[in-house]
């Protein structure tokens, strides 16, 4: 088996592109390499990078997040998803030692220590020669318990630049150079598309990934990478997670170019709780599939205003269903879609209109980072399947705000950290809809899939329907 963590000296060093390229090169069976099973992971709460890594590796990418999970849960997640893979590739976030606190307790280095992983350091070498040596030596000396097993030099200015860097690193350090990736206008163009193009546009995504994989395979010593990351320590898979034996409930899930932000383990947790997920397309389908509940996750609805607005039949059907009492949950982009309208770059587009407020896009993030929420007595899932719901840890990342809500709007959460809708509240409640800017994650501290599925079941019973009317 082979396991390694890809990190960098600072953010925006190109580690995502390198990670995607390595996942593709090692799993594709091309570039002089046999096809291997590569299990990708991503540190932190990000949605976009894992989507690309999933396509590149051909296996779902799973997030590992210190803020949302205790150490024991991270170890279990890593073992559960990585035990049957030949290669476990973990992409870090930000710099190797960057974190939320002074001790770096949630840094990439902390994850490498926890999971006993060698680190491959991606270095943006633009404008550097001899200074690369103290940069590497400083990273080694800062924490001797971290094994920097190799470096990949990125954005080089030509073969002469590469030769100088290799000579300096060989002379002053004991760290091998695993690869040297030249500055490449075409690769830079692909990198810019990564955050803009919906990865679930499969054909286009695979074309970009193939281009990245070919370039990385040609400039990184894949055999040396596998050599320094080899381990004989097997991962013991944890016990199988319990599954519901109740009759399944059908939950319609929006998944298309506009909406695609779902954690792989959240979808699995919905299934384990007894949900049958039925996917639909907000851009092309004219009505919801038959369902007992509705889920609309995050995405980029602002990039598809014309198509979403033009699909009047589906918008009307979604509104009828929610106003008729269909249990529904929406996050971020889903909340935007369910509002009256979205305003962006001088353009205004009508949306579903079940939330009596409007969305305005901004140039800078309105809410960005980790969130702590406290559910209140209005929360429709509070107590679903348990005696109560403690404070929830989650995250948000939105460039929009929801405004012109009625003064008597009911909310599900008090915001203890973060922004939410107005800095104080999140989780708009309408009928049996809960719509928030916050992205929840299924963890030991937030079992939202089981609670939502139980809520859907409760809504299907006559007693529940009689005691909890569909109030606006």
Kindly give the residue locations of the regions a language model identified.
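Residues that mark the start of a beta-strand
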Residues: 3, 36-37, 248-250, 276, ...
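C-terminal and late-domain segments of enzyme folds
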Residues: 54, 112, 245-247, 259-269, ...
